[in-house]
A protein has these predicted regions:
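Non-catalytic structural scaffold of enzyme domains
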Residues: 1-155
């Protein structure tokens, strides 16, 4: 089952994750019978990390930590500007004291195509932005900050 609570995410983006703590905990609690609950949200992930639920997995941090291990040239790709601060904060937390200065690529023009349901154009636009950025500068790792962005790997 894939579930997105857009109102919860919108409130967390506008008022901060702490403002939705109780509602997020309730939402996750309704899923406690599942074998695993996977959070793929950089905005809500740090909040979810604090919940004492053994089968709640927040994978953004793990993915970002893995990317940092590949080398100092990291590109963070986002397409929704409202996720920029949370994604960059998580990346900086994962970088720690390593000598890494990440680059953020914002594919803002792609997001309206996703909202319109045109995922093919959405994915192609992201893939093109990544190709252009990596043609100008090599990167050791490219982080796609949203799960909806994974298909460009096939483009």
């Amino acid at each position: 089952m894939h579930h997105v609570d857009e109102t919860l995410l919108a409130r967390a983006q506008s008022d901060g994750p702490a403002a939705v703590r109780q509602d997020a905990r309730y939402a996750v609690g309704t899923l406690e019978q599942a074998n695993a609950i996977v959070c793929i949200c950089s905005t809500l992930g740090p909040l979810m990390d604090g919940f004492d639920i053994p089968h709640l997995l927040c994978i953004d941090r793990t993915a970002f930590e893995a990317a940092v291990s590949y080398g100092p040239r990291i590109m963070l790709v986002i397409c929704l500007a409202s996720t920029k601060d949370a994604s960059e904060q998580l990346l900086h937390d994962c970088i720690g004291s390593n000598q890494i200065t990440p680059t953020t690529e914002i594919c803002a023009d792609a997001w309206p195509t996703f909202e319109a349901g045109d995922t093919n154009t959405f994915h192609n636009m992201i893939a093109n932005d990544i190709r252009q950025a990596t043609a100008q500068q090599p990167f050791d790792a490219v982080i796609l900050a949203q799960a909806s962005m994974l298909a460009p790997l096939r483009c």
